[in-house]
Amino acid sequence: MSLLALFFAITLGLAAADPPKDRLTYSIEWRLIHAGEAVLEYGPSSASVKLESAGLVSTLYKVQDAYRVEFDAPFCATSSMMNSSEGSRRRETAVTFDRNRGRASLTEKDLIKNSVVSKTEAQIPNCVQEVAAALLRLRRTKVEVGQSTQIPMSDGRKFAQVKVDAQERERIKTPAGTFNTVRYEANLLNGVIYSRKGRAFIWLTDDERRVPVRILLRMNFPLGTVTLDLEKEEHP
């Protein structure tokens, strides 16, 4: 799965209430240049992410990704679909989370060759989190600074209990303003869920709204650091 999945693969806690209806727009920075834009939208039983590269990055390696997940309360994934256009690659990745069987089934297709690239299954618990609904649960659950939790997570290929740490309070600035936040680290890289080496962080506002205002991936060479900063928040 592409880097789009990593940006939103952070989750913890329990919450049964309907998620907020939000549209959050992020500016993406890579190696100190504007690399693109990501839009995250939430509904009562679904979430979607759209990512598009821009500027020099788009000239070198154009990216247009769209991801959607359906879920039951409390944010238990039922299905997801990723359509990715990255460089010369065109892929469609569908995952079904069967809560009765306790299995996640993934099918990845090459849309150019019209062929199946891979099919995998993973054993999962009755309620598991994936990549976009994950952020909803983080927003609805407060883990105090210095505390951590372990949560069940699957991308359709693997299942793991992912540890999430509430590290410290920070005041940060993004294009949307200046915010008092709590920084979290999700330990889902380095073979836990994703094989890439690195670290994943997220900053939520330190208030009842708990808006995700920054997401940062600190990866090994050659990718380096990718930062998503909140640019705009809407409630359509």
PLM feature segments, named:
Residues 17-101, 138-236:
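Acidic, serine/threonine-rich low-complexity disordered tracts
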Residues 2-13:
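Bacterial N-terminal signal peptides
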Residues 93-140:
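Hydrophobic, well-structured mid-protein blocks that either form specific transmembrane helices
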